[in-house]
Amino acid sequence: MRIFIFFYFFLFNIYSQNINVNNSFIYENLRNSVLEGKIETDYTFNIRPINYNFIESQAGFKTLAKNKNSNFEIKSLGIDYFIEFNSNHPYNRNNGTMIPNRGYQHIISPGVYLKAGPLTIKFKPEHHYGVNTNFDGFWDGHYPEIWAKRYRLWNHIDLPERFGNIRHNQTKLGQSSIRINWKNYSIGVSNENIWWGPSLRNSIMLSNHAASFKHITFNTIKPIKTLIGNFEWQIITGKLENSGYNPPRTDYEYAGTKLFVPKINQRGIANDWRFLQGYIFSYSPKWIDGLSLGLIRWVQMYSDLIKGKYTWL
């Protein structure tokens, strides 16, 4: 018998400057409210996180400090508390910083939001704890050719079956960001999870299936209205690091050849981080309600290949 338990608690307040991508049920409720006509919005949900402004009246912020002109304020973002328990085999989908974990794990994420003129700072770190108990993974008794087929996946993706063999207890930046905002535009540095695409569980590109990463972003805060319709976009550049964990049985051989191929760059260097750039543009024609057309492009390369070419990397 397998038991899977997932809890999500709100302490104090529930909304932040951007609605956290990991709050999937909030997005689901928003989608349903839009379909039922309870909320009117031009957001397509193709680019997440989205700004909370269009439901601001429903937000439960607690203002800690504010001046008379409202160009300076500090607000509490409350505490998000995720709990997950698997009795037998891990479930690891749409849960951000959490890992494939048998047993108990949690994420605690307090937050505070500061606004000073065009500058906004959101500090919302995530503390993750997981017992990481051993579990039965890919069966050792499979025929070698089955292992060879499995390694076709593992050799082309950083998707460890298990994240080490000790418990996890660490704090990361989580859903934090520093931005400069002007009208409907925003530029800044962020560590937030990103979701590109109109899907519900599996995005077209980028998602919360894994922990977030550091990036620079230039994006629209809300749809830009024009004579022919609405436009949304996000352009990012960032840094992707390896998980640091290998798949199981890296010593396994098939037909006299080791199945495990270490991930190395074109110069033979292992564990090199990757530089990435990507963008998404979404267009909603004025004449057709509910239709959105999008374009997504993503480029990444190993850092050693561009070393010395860009001094700011």
What are these regions (language model features)?
Residues M1-V21:
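Bacterial Sec-dependent N-terminal signal peptides
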Residues I14-Y104, S109, Y113-T120, P125, ...:
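N-terminal periplasmic/intermembrane-space "pro-region" immediately following the signal or transit peptide
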Residues D42, T120-K122, S186-G188, N230-Q234, ...:
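Residue-level detector of the transmembrane beta-barrel scaffold of outer-membrane proteins
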Residues N67-S70, L114-P118, N181-N184, P223-W233, ...:
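Short loop/turn motifs that connect adjacent beta-strands in outer-membrane beta-barrel proteins
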Residues I83-F85, A116-P118, H127-V131, W182-N184, ...:
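Transmembrane beta-strands of outer-membrane beta-barrel pores
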Residues G103-I108, N169-S176, N181, H209-I216, ...:
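Residues that define the transmembrane beta-barrel architecture of outer-membrane proteins
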Residues P110-L114, S176-W182, V189, I216-K222, ...:
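Residues on the lipid-exposed face of transmembrane beta-strands in outer-membrane beta-barrel proteins
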Residues L159, F163, I194-W195, A210-L313:
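Signature for the C-terminal beta-barrel architecture of outer-membrane proteins
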